[in-house]
């Protein structure tokens, strides 16, 4: 049966986008989330976090609906939703945001295209377009023309251009669909051609673009469809204009019910962006690295003494003051709805390693249009200086504790990685003095971390210098080349983390109390880190089983949020989460059969 408009929302959502804007579509074909005019803009569609109010959505409701089916067109982010009624009528909604080459540049307008196709019978449908602005506080006016409707907000005007009757849309009247309908929502610009022809042309061009992009990927033999979907999702999480990468498309989806752990993730965390760039690089999608490199260079050039914040706005904004949107009711009524993220004020030393690690490939990859050179290396060296100075100083850590600071082992290792990679880059550039200097620093840091970050009592590396708590981020020590996979210390650390942080087939990031109490849900990226660590220490069969379980835990469309209830499997946290999609890609690459061995 159809899910009613007043049903509780969930994260069974399809993502569409074009690296300028994005939208989330529920299983009934209703757009319930979408920010304009860019990924971190105000939500024009906010129903996902305001389900107590019948606004902020773009619905195409089939009368007497009995079932729905949703899927992506192969190797694209073009989403199809089929709705069937009890009279034998059916319609298909095809949703996408245009993206393709035009006039020598990438065309990615602030635009959504919805095509409604009659599949069978004489379906009766009602179109409800109820955009919002001002995070639920703003009012707007509506004007109309013969083939369009304008929504006039304080800071932007949106125009719906359509070949459907405008009156029926404005009055939300049910209408018999006797022919296909095209709805184009975008800027307040006249459409000077047939709406249907424009929709078809944009559809064909967009589908071709994504087919060509996917064709360029170096995917593993196993789990190709899942990896391709994850890669497309990561691509949609990048902002072409600057090269920034958002952590997720949403704000304030709670990490766990009624927890207050509601955060705005529509910004660029340097840490998350490194993982995204690294995963796409491994698939051969180097264009993301080149654009992100431009973003990073601009951040470093604009900072004071190359000091880094942990996150920035996708336009490079440095101030992301956190506030609450009181006019929005929250996901399932769970407030607060937060705008901005005060973590930008925090000290997180791993950021220096994240930037250097993200950029390192530029010095070794001959495919790049502009490979790294001495000038870029000199821009990175001040980051290494900070890393060497700060590696043994307290910070908020990668989990962004708001109530305390420690010398976090993961942060220290990432600072070491910054200096280690600078030594490797200097060697590549044939700069012997710089190589020797950075190698000495990295060696000294490694010795300190190996001593201070290790607990003899726990027989494992621990969360912080001199501490006893365990932290799932330490599962990355092998991935970062800090220790070898067969190093007894790493094996012991994996086993200790397994014994303390594993819940069923899922992994917590930590289990001790934090600023909001005791964590209750597993953190999806940590489960993937655990899978990768198991594969590295020779427990491949178990790793493969856990990976298959994670694939079965995705949404029907193959997406993941940040968190998961380890008992029920329900997804929580902002969506879709780049961290989680990165984990899927990396684990697939680690566990797949090689192409040459597969057949």
Residue spans of the language-model regions?
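Acidic, mature catalytic/reactive cores of soluble proteins
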Residues: 1-599
């Amino acid at each position: 049966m159809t899910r009613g408009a007043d049903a509780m929302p969930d994260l069974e959502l399809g993502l569409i986008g074009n690296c300028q804007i994005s939208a989330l579509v529920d299983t009934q074909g209703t757009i319930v989330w979408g920010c304009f005019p860019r990924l971190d803009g105000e939500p024009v569609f906010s129903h996902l976090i305001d389900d107590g109010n019948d606004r902020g959505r773009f619905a195409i409701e089939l009368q007497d609906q009995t079932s729905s089916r949703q899927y992506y067109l192969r190797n694209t982010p073009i989403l199809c939703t089929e709705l069937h009624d009890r009279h034998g009528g059916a319609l298909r909604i095809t949703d996408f945001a245009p993206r393709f080459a035009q006039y020598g540049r990438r065309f990615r307008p602030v635009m959504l295209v919805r095509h409604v196709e009659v599949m069978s019978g004489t379906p009766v449908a009602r179109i409800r377009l109820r955009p919002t602005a001002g995070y639920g506080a703003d009012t707007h006016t509506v004007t109309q023309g013969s083939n369009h409707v304008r929504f006039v907000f304080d800071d932007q005007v949106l125009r719906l251009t359509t070949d459907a009757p405008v009156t029926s849309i404005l009055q939300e009247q049910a209408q018999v669909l006797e022919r296909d309908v095209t709805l184009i929502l975008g800027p307040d610009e006249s459409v000077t051609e047939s709406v249907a022809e424009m929709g078809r042309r944009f559809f064909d061009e967009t589908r071709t673009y994504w087919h060509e992009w996917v064709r360029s990927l170096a995917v593993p033999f196993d789990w190709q469809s899942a990896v391709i979907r994850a890669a497309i999702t990561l691509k949609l999480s990048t902002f072409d204009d600057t090269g920034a990468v958002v952590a997720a498309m949403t704000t304030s989806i709670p990490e766990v019910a009624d927890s207050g752990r509601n955060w705005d993730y529509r910004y660029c965390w340097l840490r998350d962006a490194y993982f995204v760039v690294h995963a796409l690089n491994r698939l051969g999608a180097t264009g993301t690295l080149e654009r992100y490199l431009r973003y990073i260079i601009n951040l470093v050039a604009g900072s004071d003494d190359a000091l880094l914040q942990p996150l920035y706005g996708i336009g490079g904004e440095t101030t992301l003051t956190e506030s609450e949107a009181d006019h929005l009711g929250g996901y399932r009524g769970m407030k607060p709805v937060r705008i901005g993220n005060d973590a930008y004020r925090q000290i997180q030393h791993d950021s220096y390693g994240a930037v250097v690690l993200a950029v390192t490939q530029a010095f070794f990859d001959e495919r790049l249009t502009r490979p790294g050179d001495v000038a870029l290396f000199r821009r990175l060296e001040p980051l290494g200086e900070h890393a060497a100075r700060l590696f043994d100083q307290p910070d908020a850590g990668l989990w962004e504790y708001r109530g305390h600071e420690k010398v976090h082992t993961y942060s220290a290792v990432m600072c070491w990685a910054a200096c280690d990679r600078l030594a490797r880059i200097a060697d590549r550039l044939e700069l012997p003095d710089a190589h020797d200097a950075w190698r000495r620093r990295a060696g000294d840091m490694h010795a300190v971390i190996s001593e201070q970050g290790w607990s003899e009592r726990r027989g494992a590396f621990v969360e912080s210098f001199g501490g006893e708590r365990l932290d799932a981020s330490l599962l990355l020590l092998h991935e970062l080349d800090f220790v070898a996979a067969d190093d007894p210390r790493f094996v012991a650390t994996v086993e200790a983390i397994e014994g303390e942080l594993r819940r069923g087939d899922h992994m917590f990031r930590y289990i001790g109390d934090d600023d909001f109490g005791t964590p209750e849900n597993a953190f999806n990226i940590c489960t993937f880190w655990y899978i990768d660590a198991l594969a590295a220490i020779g427990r491949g069969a178990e790793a493969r089983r856990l990976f298959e379980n994670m694939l079965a835990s995705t949404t029907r469309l193959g997406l993941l949020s940040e968190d998961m209830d380890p008992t029920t499997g329900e997804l929580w946290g902002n969506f879709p989460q780049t961290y989680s999609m990165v984990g899927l890609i990396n684990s697939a690459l680690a566990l797949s059969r090689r192409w040459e061995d597969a057949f």
